[in-house]
Amino acid sequence: MHFKDKRVLTIKTTDDMLKILESKGNPLKDFKKGTKITVYNKMEQGYSYVLAENPGENMGEDFKPYYTPAEMLALGCFEGKYFNQNLLEFPKEWFINAIKKGKLSPQGANPECNYFKVKSRLTLQEWKDYGWVPDDDGKINKKHPILSDPNKNPDAGGIAIWFFRHWMGRRIPELDEIQIKRWKAYARHAGQIKANCKPGDLTCRPRQRQSLLQWFYKADI
């Protein structure tokens, strides 16, 4: 299996992505319990993990995400920009399908790639300021000591990259418990939509619906 290619650091177009995927992409069937994955992108280099479960299996009794990572990418999330340098870390089918659907935009964040065609996320720097991901200077956030600690949270890209890796089969019990609690708390946004929108009216609260998709909750409620 291939996990490192310097071309991922200079991706400009979906054609660049397809060339890498065609020559070095890893199919889903090759990922299984015991597979060691090496991460290589601009944000994360030198990190690796071993799958403790087969992809999509035994994610936790109280963790039942509505979407799979493949479905999230195909529907459109994070302006088509977020996961593009992780194309060798995850199954190539995910990216090829999303490219075919016009949902990836390596040349720059594009809200039109989102399912609801609106921007619905904070910046990475804001995530760092809140303590949801490790900061560049290694400062520990008192409110979120585990999430902000680079020695305990290897996911520089936040809860979505945590979910992709968790779905694949990585397990970090302490971190997993925290992220699943955050995910469960996010259900309040679904409650707000149900309280303020007619069922199936996708024009009502599109930003909040997009955020639900990006937190792996059913968005077309």
Residue ranges and their predicted role:
Residues 2-4, 17:
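Long, compositionally biased low-complexity regions that are usually intrinsically disordered
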Residues 10-154, 170, 188-207:
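Compositionally biased, intrinsically disordered low-complexity regions enriched for acidic
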Residues 154-221:
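Low-complexity, intrinsically disordered activation/interaction regions
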